Swiss-Prot record:
May be involved in the metabolism of insect hormones and in the breakdown of synthetic insecticides. InterPro entries: Cyt_P450 (IPR001128), Cyt_P450_CS (IPR017972), Cyt_P450_E_grp-I (IPR002401), Cyt_P450_sf (IPR036396), Cytochrome_P450_fam2 (IPR050182). It is found in: Endoplasmic reticulum membrane; Microsome membrane. Heme binds at C450. This is Probable cytochrome P450 305a1. One of its GO terms (cellular component) is endoplasmic reticulum membrane. Transmembrane segments: none annotated. Its main location: endoplasmic reticulum. Keywords: Endoplasmic reticulum, Heme, Iron, Membrane, Metal-binding, Microsome, Monooxygenase, Oxidoreductase. PROSITE patterns: CYTOCHROME_P450 (PS00086). The lineage of its organism: Eukaryota, Metazoa, Ecdysozoa, Arthropoda, Hexapoda. Belongs to the cytochrome P450 family. GO terms for molecular function: heme binding; iron ion binding; monooxygenase activity; oxidoreductase activity, acting on paired donors, with incorporation or reduction of molecular oxygen.
């Protein structure tokens, strides 16, 4: 009996200690809401984020409440620090100590149960594969003339599609996404997917869109309490995520196997792409007998990372730009006047590639303002402190998750004066030239800068110039698009319709 009493006392003592320690704030940790034993701020965070319209808004409210550009909280057992404001955001993005990625259930679920790819890895694996992937993507034209050629073909295809609508109201987002995805697919797989081809393109887009809506930047309840997948796999979205992961993996593997068969027939294909280059690297390393991290799963995750980085945010930005054009005819006509003049000054067959953007200052400024105003990636991908360090005078524990609020920089009232006003002129100087403001950072900064920035900037610019040049974007009678975006890892506009009226 005494032994039983002793064991009960030990158990009770452990529970009390666990309750106290789980609610204790680390010494000199950034200010934030009080921790609830065992749960941290998880339930409070989810409830308040839903009430105010998103976690990015909640972080800014907490920063104001606690009068700090660093907010410290605890989600489950994970310490989280949110960096807000230009100074803190810039410092986090440029310091090596914050280049890590968290290793948690949420991020492994995003990468199909692995810790592979580029975006969600760190250390030597991240450095080696980012370097290889970016080098090979440049070799096949990423950010160069070959990519411009693919953009030109897709832009002309898109114009034809819009003309065939015969000015009927349409939701443009799917058509835009198909065009952007095809440019990326040409670089990755060496071919485009025809829009009429057995629904493959639409199916892939649907998979990507459905998958992105199942995540938020903190991973939802599954990130803090992974065991919930065993209790409520449907309600937590776990089963659906697994289904979508399986379908995406199958789609990518089919393409990889097709490339493998082609390589077996011709070891030196005339047209290269990322998949060919990767398979060749796998073969070379295997022949050399060296231990290698180059494998099929890593290739699949790399493809997925480029898709996420380069396709959805790009098409959503163009979609938002078209919505603004329809809502602001004054801005649209000013853009049309400059586009017409700039195109007339060039040769008649000169396509408006990004390399010519200096002739389109107002368009360049307009695009920047769309990115600043809507900030579709309000919180960038989570970082991890690689070692214990200091930030803003506070102690940051090793392995703490760091979230970066780009929205707080893009809507900084002290800097922008009128951040809630849509005004492209803020990016035009006294000489009438477009300039980049230091507070403008839609793709992030440093070595963790977005993988898809070159594709995004080129597609957004060229597609918009061509659309404005050939069409008036008009709201149908009774249509009133919402400026409030839908939440997710990236923010997206609510469905809306516009008419594309051919200019004469």
């Amino acid at each position: 009996m005494s032994a039983l009493i002793f064991l009960c006392a030990i158990l009770i003592g452990f529970v009390i200690y666990s309750l106290i320690s789980s609610a204790r704030r680390p010494k000199n940790f950034p200010p934030g809401p009080r921790f609830v034993p065992w749960l941290g701020n998880t339930l409070q965070f989810r409830k308040e984020a839903s009430a105010v319209g998103g976690q990015h808004i909640l972080f800014e409210r907490w920063a104001k409440d606690f009068r700090s550009d660093l907010v410290g909280l605890k989600l489950g057992r994970e310490y989280v620090v949110v960096a807000l404001g230009h100074e803190m955001v810039k410092e986090v993005q440029l310091q090596e100590v914050f280049e890590g990625r968290p290793d948690n259930f949420f991020l492994r679920l995003r990468t199909m149960g692995t810790r592979k790819g580029i975006t969600c890895t760190d250390g030597q694996l991240w450095y080696e594969h980012r370097h290889f992937a970016m080098k090979q993507m440049r070799n096949v034209g990423y950010g160069r003339s070959q990519m411009e050629h693919h953009i030109e073909l897709e832009a002309e295809e898109l114009l034809g599609q819009l003309e065939r609508t015969e000015e009927q109201p349409i939701e443009p987002v799917t058509w835009l996404a198909q065009s952007v995805l095809n440019v990326l697919w040409c670089l990755i797989a060496g071919k485009r997917i025809a829009r009429q081809e057995d629904g493959t393109l639409r199916r892939l887009l649907d998979l990507m869109n459905r998958r992105s809506k199942l995540f938020d930047i903190c991973g939802g309840l599954l990130a803090q309490f992974p065991w919930l997948r065993h209790v409520a796999p449907d309600r937590t979205g776990y089963n659906l995520i697994q289904q979508l992961n399986t379908e995406l993996y199958g789609f990518f593997m089919d393409t990889i196997e097709e490339h493998r068969r082609q390589l077996a027939k011709d070891p030196s294909p005339a047209e290269s792409d990322l998949i060919y280059a990767y398979l060749q690297e796998m073969k070379d390393r295997s022949a050399g007998g060296e231990s290698s991290t180059f494998n099929e799963t890593q290739l699949v995750m790399t493809i997925l990372d480029f898709f996420i980085a380069g396709s959805q945010t790009t098409s959503n930005t163009i979609n938002l730009a078209l919505m603004v054009l329809a809502m602001r005819p004054d801005v649209q006509e000013k853009l049309f006047s400059q586009v017409t003049a700039s195109v007339a000054a060039a040769s008649t067959d000169a396509f408006p590639h990004l390399s010519r953007r200096e002739a389109f200052d107002y368009m360049d400024a307009f695009i920047m303002e769309v990115q600043r105003f809507f900030h579709i990636t309000p919180i960038t991908g989570p970082r991890r402190a690689l070692w214990a360090t200091k930030l803003g005078g506070y102690d940051i524990p090793k392995n703490a998750t760091i979230l970066i609020s780009l929205r707080s920089v893009h809507l900084d009232k002290e800097h922008w004066k009128d951040p809630l006003e849509f005004r492209p002129e803020r990016f035009i100087d006294s000489a009438g030239k477009c300039f980049k403001d230091e507070y403008f950072m839609p793709f992030g900064m440093g070595r963790r800068r977005c993988l898809g920035d070159a594709l995004a900037r080129a597609c957004i610019f060229s597609f918009l110039v061509r659309i404005v040049q050939h069409f008036s974007v008009v709201l149908p009678a009774g249509e009133s698009p919402s400026m409030v975006l839908l939440p997710g890892i990236t923010l997206t506009p609510k469905p809306y319709k516009v008419q594309f009226v051919k200019r004469t």
